[in-house]
């Protein structure tokens, strides 16, 4: 796919950068009662408006548009997983203009890796990007598929792209200081930035 070549080159050529700092914790006044003050510890978010802007820009990408429309069951792209993409953008530490289509899928894959116990959703990302992979072939057909794959240059190319995707996923994960967990409070904060955004209507619970 055309999206891969440009994104792959830009990500491979990125210079070594300082890892994004971890969010600090501050004490804020929650309640005043006479001379008494109740303090509550709150984590300072590192998500900036520019990270939301990068996310919104990528939503206009034709490949991402097709992917979101393709995921009708919201198995890999419900509102919480998409909110995690924005958080990951803030943690990776890249300038907002450098985020491209490949970064969206890397972040979304990591979000699924973190939140979903089922392996199928992550495989669906590969299925969309590269077509049917070995993991989605029934067991009795695997030997035949292995033979065809050896004879099919396109199948070998798809396999190598998946391997490269996993390599880039690990690099992206390291750029976030290996911090993939996102708290419920952070997810609420992301959605509260623009509560009317159409992606927050992608609620998997409403489909069940």
UniProtKB/Swiss-Prot annotation:
- What is the protein's given name? Putative speedy protein E7
The UniProt entry's sequence similarity note says: Belongs to the Speedy/Ringo family.
Q: Which Pfam families match?
A: Spy1
Q: What PANTHER family does this protein map onto?
A: WBSCR19-LIKE PROTEIN (PTHR31156)
What stretches pass through the bilayer? Answer: none
Q: Which domain of life is it from?
A: Eukaryota
Q: Which InterPro entries match?
A: Speedy
Record organism: Homo sapiens
